């Protein structure tokens, strides 16, 4: 088939703002984000778009439920990275033939959203106490709606190809049904309980937190050594009360070290280790708690660390989790000294009531000192638990809460990992997952908030029983009384999020979506929520659906600034994704993030980082514009009917190898490897070599040769656009649109009609018939000669535009020990050079290329280098600053040698060679060979200049 192409025009300047919004609108208009499906003609309210869906032809599915961003504001760069990686995978899988579904949605984010609303009210001079629960929730709904619109806009600008007809919210009606079903099911299975327990309490948020919602920060503090008066034995026996504290009355004392002197007010015991010889005689004695004159016993417990402080510790069960355990073992009273807002309550002396913990600490330390009871104070740095949202210091607090028994759920999740039902990428996170599950504690799921899923439990005032129900109830299930009250608390946000993979598909209803798309394929998220979300989703999937909710877990790094610091407003180091898009375009943003996202590592960026992605997108635009310009008026043939040159076969071979690398990398979630492979192919192999070489064909008068070259370029451009599309969807779709339908038909790349979009075209596949080692070796020899000339010109400071005279001489095995093994593959370098003389001269800027016999003398005025099987002489009549040239070559050699040593160390690491993917190890070996060849070449330059490689310098 042949077509004569009409004029194809791309604007001369790459301007992403001119087409990105239009391209995305086109995708949405054509419903390109929906799974490949057909309507059955019957109504199904559970369907994504109001119609039932049936997977066409039993195609394999690939499903991701987006990690729902919080509705508290705009998406930051971390969300952006996460979105880009998911979209790359979804676009790749869609083009690779999978029936893909990417479910978008947002999270109600209980604590965080309530903070936002309370802050907004305070700006208006309104306190939360002044509004009703219903008014507060209504105000929160308004903020939620506004922020959801912003999040949708941002995701669209990033190019997210999610199915918007399936969008969910963790507090929508369907999710509420799922949450209630999960709660009641756990209750019926005996995995839920309500108990007075010591919880992590945020006094600023006014709610309990789970262990995983407490972050730890290193803070300056003090270790206070406090004297506790020891009661005389006579008073102990008589159960006497000591006199009021005063310096004169303090007799024998014991010394206890504490970082929290304010909790002395709730002490109920002092503990020592039972094997501590220093205190054997004190076990069973009694002491007086300072400031409150409470008489408490000295007990023995093996938890006590003999090397901490003095080896004696105060026991405050209501305000320390370890003390709570000790108190439980010894049946000690738990005295709660705090109000919910963190102030001291009426369980303490009047002088301290109403003070915050920080204020009480200052006052008590002063009082201890005044009474002669503060032995000393030692400044320390210690770990302090803070709220993950507001960073207020967490207080252990005794309160009535709902808990999930986690050990039975964790055992299932561990068993699934052992069966390899779940795969972690990178694998190092498996250890973190296992360690957390093996040491898991029960999960506190109740939160003292107004925004969230209300706990579906009603308490009866008549019979004091509780009713747990999937639906709202009006009467007690036990006595029938109407005097019932629903639990005022809401559930932890993560209680809805852990159901996300299947609740988004309609669970607990057995919907067609659930049958078709569950379990999902993968979860892609940051490593910092492996506990909050990933592990819990696996447990929920196994408990409620009897299967893991996904097979692959890809945990990417966090986005930080160039100094490795977390991005924050206080540091003013944040990078706004929308600003990047406005400045460089969405494709630049996407490609840069993918290129820099190495598995298991954080991504360090700054504003200028995105120039790389911008340059690459611009390169794609300009190269495509050149190719399309040369297609005008040409007769383009189907590639099957084109006679390919060896250069053509080389580029198809190289493209073929790249396709295999990219597909392998994407299947393994190695995004940076895939991005680097497409970058290397397009910029170097395709543009710098093949497109440049094609200019020779278009400069010839032979019209048939021009048509042949145009046909190959047209095919390569179309296939390359498909290869690049998951990374650069906007620019590739826009360029593809510029290819006329006749090009599509001619290349037979995609079927006509519905799949006229690039994003719906098939992804390139590895084609064994395109492998051509001979062409690869020959063009490799051409490239080596051209690179040698270019490098030598640069080293001599010769203008790239100035033509030079070159002599090529075969090297003998004695001159080049590495050549012998490779010459058989390359054949005669001289013969290859003669075949491609025109191309070599054009690419290297050579005016005269002369071939010498192996025993010919070196030209008189020349600088030389050596390659695989040849010596190359650059003849020049101009004077060369040999000292400067030697220095330049010396520095270049040192850098090349350091590269050799770096890769050698990596390959000498048995762990790396054993555990790294085979293609990664192969790539490193290729790097080593290339680095050694560079060293060899540079050493040849130095030898020719009568210099020699010098010692290595770390600074070079």
UniProtKB/Swiss-Prot annotation:
GO cellular component: cytosol
CDD domains for the chain: Anticodon_Ia_Val, ValRS_core
A Pfam family that the UniProt record links to this protein: Val_tRNA-synt_C
Gene Ontology terms for molecular function: aminoacyl-tRNA deacylase activity; ATP binding; valine-tRNA ligase activity
Location of this chain's protein in the cell: Cytoplasm
Catalytic reactions of this protein: tRNA(Val) + L-valine + ATP = L-valyl-tRNA(Val) + AMP + diphosphate
Entry EC no(s): 6.1.1.9
Short motif ('KMSKS' region): ranges: 566-570
Protein origin, superkingdom: Bacteria
Major site of localization recorded for this protein: cytoplasm
Alphabetized InterPro entries for the sequence: aa-tRNA-synth_I_CS (IPR001412), aa-tRNA-synth_Ia (IPR002300), Anticodon_Ia_Val (IPR033705), M/V/L/I-tRNA-synth_anticd-bd (IPR013155), Rossmann-like_a/b/a_fold (IPR014729), tRNA-bd_arm (IPR010978), tRNAsynth_Ia_anticodon-bd (IPR009080), Val-tRNA_synth_C_sf (IPR037118)
Ranges spanned by the short sequence motif 'HIGH' region, renumbered to the chain: 69-79
Protein name: Valine--tRNA ligase
Record organism: Treponema pallidum (strain Nichols)
